[in-house]
Regions:
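Conserved nucleotide-binding/hydrolysis micro-motifs of P-loop NTPases
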Residues: 1-3, 29, 81-84, 154-156, ...
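Coupling/hinge elements of helicase-like and P-loop NTPase modules
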Residues: 21, 58-71, 102-103, 272-281
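Conserved P-loop NTPase motor "coupling/switch" region that bridges the ATPase
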Residues: 1-63, 240-243
Length: 293
């Protein structure tokens, strides 16, 4: 349970929430997407936390569980010449339209094609995939270890799924039914021939125990650090026996580097812009840093 709207039933049952669902959701959820029916972010979280604190005793995982360590590292790749040209053209288009973007409903959506380009869409050349394949071999994935591979987008997961079929991967994305997702999870956990689980951060990043994985690879990251932490913790929970190595694939000199920096150093500013609360100055600052303008 990772969305504010999911708490309404529990809080109502406990007797601490008396508002109808639609009012609860409008208080704590940022709506967007087609028709404004999709939850795209959260707001008023201090108020929600205050409500939760009346009925919840929180303990951090590292305070109550004796788990193996989790090690984070970054693996850098270089875009190909063709990708660099495409990246520059897309970036220049964003810069040319920047004043309109600053006042748009979802300003960060302008970076979508840049992010997908670094992940391997739009060209046959894919440095991240090539490096990942080398690393899978180097890390002895064929000899007993298993790995999770995450992306934000189904289109990118499809590319990696097709390229890595030799590892008999499980596949968990939004279009896969709940029953089949569960079957894929069981296959990854119990079938020694299933070496990889490939999925989206949204679908595979919550609600699953995937403790057979010793490695977690991010092709790209979610805007919200908590979503990435949830995803990597599919492998780092009760039942984990080995050290979990979390590896982020980052294209040098691109928006990938900017996102990594914000997730580590300035999540508050990032969150304001993602949640639609950022000022025009905030949005400009974030885009300038992401695009290295």
């Amino acid at each position: 349970m990772n969305k504010a709207e999911d708490l309404w039933n529990i809080l109502t049952w406990l007797g601490v929430e008396n508002r109808p669902f639609y009012r609860f959701r409008s208080t704590y959820c940022v709506m967007g997407g087609y028709g404004g029916y999709k939850v795209v972010g959260h707001k008023n979280l201090e108020s929600l936390n205050a409500e939760l604190n009346t009925v919840m005793l929180r303990r951090k995982k590292d305070e109550v569980l004796d788990l193996p360590p989790k090690i984070h590292s970054t693996e850098y790749v270089e875009l190909t010449k063709k990708q660099q040209i495409m990246y520059r053209d897309i970036k220049n288009g964003i810069i040319a339209d920047l004043e309109n973007i600053l006042t748009s409903v979802n300003p960060l959506s302008c970076t979508l094609r840049l992010r997908q380009l670094t992940g391997g869409l739009f060209t046959e050349e894919n440095p991240k995939l090539e490096r990942l394949m080398d690393m899978l071999s180097e890390e002895n994935i064929p000899n007993g270890y298993k790995a999770l591979i995450f992306s934000q987008w189904e289109k990118i997961t499809e590319v990696y799924y097709e390229a890595l079929k030799e590892y008999n991967p499980a596949y968990i994305v939004g279009k896969v039914s709940p029953e089949d997702r569960e079957a894929e999870k069981e296959r990854f956990q119990n079938d020694p021939e299933c070496k990889l689980a490939i999925g989206t951060i949204g679908a595979m990043g919550t609600g699953f125990t995937l403790t057979k994985a010793s490695y977690v690879f991010f092709i790209d990251k979610a805007w919200v650090s908590g979503d990435n932490a949830q995803a990597e913790d599919r492998a780092h929970r009760i039942g984990t026996e080995d050290t979990v190595n979390v590896i982020s694939l980052v294209a040098k000199g691109t928006i990938d580097e900017g996102i990594e920096e914000y997730l580590i150093e300035n999540q508050d500013l990032f969150d304001r812009v993602v949640d639609g609360k950022g000022s025009k100055h905030d949005i400009r600052q974030v885009l300038n840093n992401l695009l290295k303008i």
